[in-house]
Each structure stands twice: as C-alpha cells, then as structure tokens.
C-alpha cells in the first residue's frame, strides 16, 4: 500500500510537528494533493500524496513530532468521499461526515489512540470525535467527554463549538465561581500563565543560545547622518513610483546596497567557519528580518549585487508579505550570507543584534532621531541621526575589519548618490 512520508525539507531540518490534517481517513486524494500541514523550525509546509486513491490511515496525530522519512499515512485504491478537506467534509453532508468519522475510528493507529486517551472521560472511555473536533477541543481547552455528538454519537467540530458557547454563557452567569489563576510553584500566591512554546519559538531559543555559546560575538557601533539619503529619497520619491509601477523607495534598499559594497570590500564578513575551514561566500544573499505573529523570521533576498533599487524594494516587500501571510517556502529561509535587522521600526535607539545561524555578522539599523550635531568647531545643527551596530564573530573577523565595514556603511549612506551610480 502506498505510503506518505515526511519529505526531505532542508539540510538543517530533521523533524516537524503535524499542525493539521487536511484530509480525513476515507477521503479521496489526488496525486500531488496536500493531505496535512507540517510545522517546521522555519516555515509551515504542506505534505502531499504521491498517489491517487483513498486515505486509509493516519499514522500520527495533530501535535505529534515526526522525523524526515517517517511514514505518516497510507493511501489505498478507491474513490473515497467526495470532500477534499476537513472543513468541506464537515460542511457538505451530516451523514457523510458521520460515516467518515466512523471509518476513521474503526481503524485507530497507536498514536491516534494515545491522543484520544488524553481527551477521554474519567472512566477512560474513548470519545468518538473527528480530527477537527479533537483539534478544536485541544486548542480551546474543551473536555470532549462533556460534549454530546449528534448522529452516530460522533463528536464533530460544531458540537465542540456549541458546547464551548454554552459553557461560556454559564460562566458569565456564575462570576462568583470563577476559577483561580494557575499558581507557579516558586510563588504560590502569585498568578501566572503557563503555555507550551511553539516549535518555532523553541527552535529560535535553542539556536540563539547556541550562537551565544559557540561564537566569540562582539558588537561595534557607529552613527549615520541620514540627512542626504532622506533628501534624496524625498526628491526621487514620486518619480521612482512612476518609473517602477508603484514601487516605493525605502531606506532598506540603500542599506542593502551599502552592505553589498561593504561585503565586497571586507569579504571575511561574508564568511563562516566549517570545522577547521573558513568558507568565504562569493554571493550576496542578504536576510531581512521580518516581524510576524509567529516571531521574527529572516527570509533572504537572493543576488542582491545584481539587483537595482526597485528590484530590491520589490523583493523585500514580497518577502515581508509572504512572511506575514505564512507563505514563505524553505527556499526563502536557507543559505543566506548576511543579515540586516531594523529595530528602529519598533522604536529601538540602540541594540546588539545576535548573529543569524552560521553567518559571521549582522547589521542592526535603529530609529532616526533628530539631535544636535557639531558640524565643525563653530557650528551645531540638528540632524536626523541613526545608530548602526555590527555584531560579529571575532573568530572570523578582526576588530579592525569590523570597524572598517561599519564605517563603509556610514560613508555610503551619507553619500547616497554613490550608491545610485554603482547600481
């Protein structure tokens, strides 16, 4: 019987968590059709069936951790149910759903049984429920043993939702009986909230700690007078939009261009250590940190040295949209050479960014703040200033090169016409 395995995703990804089954047991499956969503350390990916037929078994449950190459489902011959997803299945036909759920529960796998036991009643009697019902109950803290199922006594998602609404209504009428907040063991009289970290959050925490422990990280600072680049941007803004189909000229393209020039001048900043070797990259794939609901993601703009300002702005904007819409692919997230992060969008005046992955350095941008600057010994003017930071691995980059790199960034941003001429 054809098997569905966790596919090879990227060199650094060895496992993932099943976020959601998109197909129920008994559903028809087309070749190349997604049957589940897998959460990895970097992005969520859909796992597809390589065969046409009927989903016979789910060999892991939502929330289970599965490894690359592990068999997670089987597909057999037949036409199956007409519905193509869990939500469509629940919406189209009450009787079809009940038959579908009965099929699934008639052949439970070991991992499914374990999952169901966690949602059983005090007498350890298994609750018959569809995957979407189990998931909704788990995410919202609903005890399935308290939910009554319609038709065939199978609990469906709408049964859980109705039970949840009824419980909330009852709770609002009995405010005097509110449950006390969960207490921590260290401070028994203080309220806390305890929740499980997402896979991506756990991975980020692990990797950040690894970087701190395994690199000789230092940070050097400089300041940039943003007067000229702001005036140039203001002067070119409208014409740039007309010439490039609505693409706006932002600061990030200037800093990306400056970073490419500085990386060419100081190639060790574009390097990494591999065992006893140092690998100096001859390409310029620069990561741009994007804040999302799932935390900070760093997709990479490829071949920045070959892109003009408009192409850079479009690429950066497209990656930001994909990141916030959770549509980034693994190809967007791996094999970068350098990273830029902008804490200034959140109001940060100065920070020490942490190096990303196996890279040698990261550039930090910050808020633009108008403050008095001594132009010469007799003149003080208010200028829009930005602090910039370069965190770097001292095992690869000497202090002289780090300072020189950041000074090059400063000089190019303060003379932005040079960047335009280069591109």
Curated annotation (Swiss-Prot):
Record keyword Acyltransferase present: yes
Cofactors (names): (R)-lipoate
Top-level enzyme category: transferase
Region listing for Disordered, in residue ranges: 74-204
SUPFAM superfamilies to which the protein is assigned, alphabetical: CoA-dependent acyltransferases, Peripheral subunit-binding domain of 2-oxo acid dehydrogenase complex, Single hybrid motif
Pathway: Amino-acid degradation; L-lysine degradation via saccharopine pathway; glutaryl-CoA from L-lysine: step 6/6
Cofactor note: Binds 1 lipoyl cofactor covalently.
GO cellular component assignments: cytosol; oxoglutarate dehydrogenase complex
Family: Belongs to the 2-oxoacid dehydrogenase family.
Assembly: Forms a 24-polypeptide structural core with octahedral symmetry. Part of the 2-oxoglutarate dehydrogenase (OGDH) complex composed of E1 (2-oxoglutarate dehydrogenase), E2 (dihydrolipoamide succinyltransferase) and E3 (dihydrolipoamide dehydrogenase); the complex contains multiple copies of the three enzymatic components (E1, E2 and E3).
Protein name: Dihydrolipoyllysine-residue succinyltransferase component of 2-oxoglutarate dehydrogenase complex
Species, as recorded: Staphylococcus haemolyticus (strain JCSC1435)
